[in-house]
């Protein structure tokens, strides 16, 4: 599933996460898999091999995937489908949560 976050900060990083039967494989890259990008540009993708870096990326993805205010997923017809929040649960806005996460790590 493709999840997009459309909010204050412009983001272009692509993270691919494959469960791989309990042994997660993560990759970082620049392409967004559009035809013009794959055939007319040079794009790069690299595996994440360091266990600490891998865990940090998984933590970051967890924050982003919990977004219930500015996140949407792309359906099979390439339409944006906005996530709906449960009325009783906190409505996470991941870019601000992510900012606080990084701020705490640097203090």
Region locations from a protein language model:
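PLD/PLD-like phosphodiesterase catalytic module centered on the HKD motif
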Residues: 1-107
């Amino acid at each position: 599933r493709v999840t997009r976050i459309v909010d204050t900060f412009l983001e272009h990083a692509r993270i691919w996460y494959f469960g791989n039967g309990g042994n997660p494989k993560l990759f970082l890259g620049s392409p967004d898999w559009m035809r013009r990008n794959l055939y007319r540009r040079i794009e790069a993708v690299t595996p994440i091999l360091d266990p600490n870096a891998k865990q940090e990326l998984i933590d970051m993805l967890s924050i982003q995937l919990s977004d219930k205010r500015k996140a949407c997923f792309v359906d099979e017809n390439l339409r944006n489908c906005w996530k709906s929040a449960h009325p009783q649960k906190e409505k996470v806005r991941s870019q601000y949560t992510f900012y606080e996460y990084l701020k705490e790590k640097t203090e």
